[in-house]
């Protein structure tokens, strides 16, 4: 079973993350930020990656540390669960419609973190979550997990739909990328014989 577990404790946040790449999309998420919880739950449900995320952060300051640190820990847990990445699909891509909104997500579990985020929001908050932190969340996950990640909003007007479309697209692309392909016989999916660098 491909699992990862990260405990990350700082003066700003205390975090426990557990993931199971071969799960069923079960989740237990509590960050203290309701809309972020909702998005991580969407990620788990649509990627079929089981996610436990428990965060006690300094929300009396603002939401930045909780958002960033939970994303870093999630990326680290995903990286731990992937191990040497033998046999994985490596690449994933998804178009994700939600009513009037359509987004596109493409990713490569390459070991070379890079994020392109081309989406904007017309309001400052979704629930109580600052929308400027959405891009930062994806950057932090990709950096910690070693993922090349491209996110593009093709069109859409409703901010909730835009965010949820992106998270669901990320989930579906991750499902493709982490899936084991029996034809590869456990080989590393790179002509270099390794991923990263």
Curated annotation (Swiss-Prot):
Pathway: Amino-acid biosynthesis; L-histidine biosynthesis; L-histidine from 5-phospho-alpha-D-ribose 1-diphosphate: step 6/9. It is an enzyme of class 4 (lyase). This is Imidazoleglycerol-phosphate dehydratase. The keyword Cytoplasm applies. It comes from the Bacteria. Transmembrane segments: none annotated. Keywords: Amino-acid biosynthesis, Cytoplasm, Histidine biosynthesis, Lyase. GO terms for cellular component: cytoplasm. InterPro entries: IGPD_sf (IPR038494), ImidazoleglycerolP_deHydtase (IPR000807), ImidazoleglycerP_deHydtase_CS (IPR020565), Ribosomal_Su5_D2-typ_SF (IPR020568). GO terms for biological process: L-histidine biosynthetic process. It is found in: Cytoplasm. It catalyses: D-erythro-1-(imidazol-4-yl)glycerol 3-phosphate = 3-(imidazol-4-yl)-2-oxopropyl phosphate + H2O. PANTHER family: IMIDAZOLEGLYCEROL-PHOSPHATE DEHYDRATASE, IMIDAZOLEGLYCEROL-PHOSPHATE DEHYDRATASE HIS7. GO terms for molecular function: imidazoleglycerol-phosphate dehydratase activity. PROSITE patterns: IGP_DEHYDRATASE_1 (PS00954), IGP_DEHYDRATASE_2 (PS00955). Pfam families: IGPD (PF00475). Its EC number is 4.2.1.19. Belongs to the imidazoleglycerol-phosphate dehydratase family. It comes from Erythrobacter litoralis (strain HTCC2594).
